Amino acid sequence: MLRKLVTGALAAALLLSGQSNAQNACQQTQQLSGGRTINNKNETGNGNGNYKYEIWRDGNGGSLTLYPKDAAFKASWNNSGDFLGRVGLTFNKPAATNLGGDLIANYNYKKSGSDGGTYSYIGIYGWMDNPQIEYYVVDDWMHNRGAPGGSYMGSQKGTITVDGGTYKVWSGQRTGASKWGTSTFTQIFSIRTSPRQCGSINVSEHFRQWQKLGLRLGGLMEAQLLAESGGGSGYVDFTYATITIGGSSSNASAPSNNNNNNNNNNDNNGNWNNWNNNNNNNNNNNNNNNNNNNNQGGGNCAAIWGQCGGSGYNGPKCCKQGSCKQINQWYSQCQ
């Protein structure tokens, strides 16, 4: 995801806790109140304890309420284009799988609204360095189009089982805006096949499973609970949220490699072409159609709902159907 306001500050101390039980998180339903609200601006800063926060919006309305308890927050948006709210920990680039204990996120939230038919993520998000990696663990989303997935995420590397759930793992290369300006970096996604609104994410176990699939990791810069939407109006309200180090590792099955070419395409009966969004326009090395053909008659032009432009994008810039509409500076779509 494109982030202009992210800091790489080191957490002053790593939090230790044994609260890694999903059942406990799902029992934390009391509505929170109070705290501080940031309205209609892009900002990063310090939250409770060692937690850091960020709100980022690409126009129009959005707010982030920081509750006076742990990493709990409420993110709200109103036709704000790309919007995100996130709270979590930052690190000084230790090896992702050598943190002195497992990195565990516990959460419970309510949600309402939609992503405007584009894209949305709820889960864990962060960056690594050397190599540059943007990563997601997605447990839920704001739409009813099925689990995210498709060639815009790169290629499917396999499936893993973590915290009692099955995740499809995708990875690809992207060139565009990043924490380092404009650069080429790797994206890694764990997409849960059955969404949930409470539980525990053993982030460290995802890291280990990614390595078993042959993915190279870097030094950890951040791990934060995320609510992101590419449009529409709605909110995600975390009534309980902690990110700790020191929990025990969850039981995880060995990853299953996936070399089926069909999995590199839309795996939701065609419903996911319109999820090819501004944050995940991978310049995928497996996509031979990524060229600068401007032939408006078709040929290598993008299909309906496909990407046709944006900062850092090197693919087709014409549409087989409809016309190319700019969504924001990073993403234009055939509509």
Swiss-Prot record:
EC class: hydrolase
Pathway the protein takes part in: Glycan degradation; xylan degradation
Gene: xynS20
Protein's UniProt name: Endo-1,4-beta-xylanase S20
EC numbers: 3.2.1.8
A GO MF term: cellulose binding
Pfam family for this entry, one: CBM_1
Provenance organism: Neocallimastix patriciarum (Rumen fungus)
Active-site residues, Swiss-Prot/TrEMBL: 134 (nucleophile), 228 (proton donor)
Composition-biased stretches (Low complexity): 257-291
Domain CBM1 residue range list: 300-335
Activity's thermal dependence: Optimum temperature is 45 degrees Celsius.
All residue ranges annotated as the GH11 domain in the record: 39-241
PANTHER family: ENDO-1,4-BETA-XYLANASE A-RELATED
pH dependence: Optimum pH is 6.0.
Protein family according to the UniProt entry: Belongs to the glycosyl hydrolase 11 (cellulase G) family.
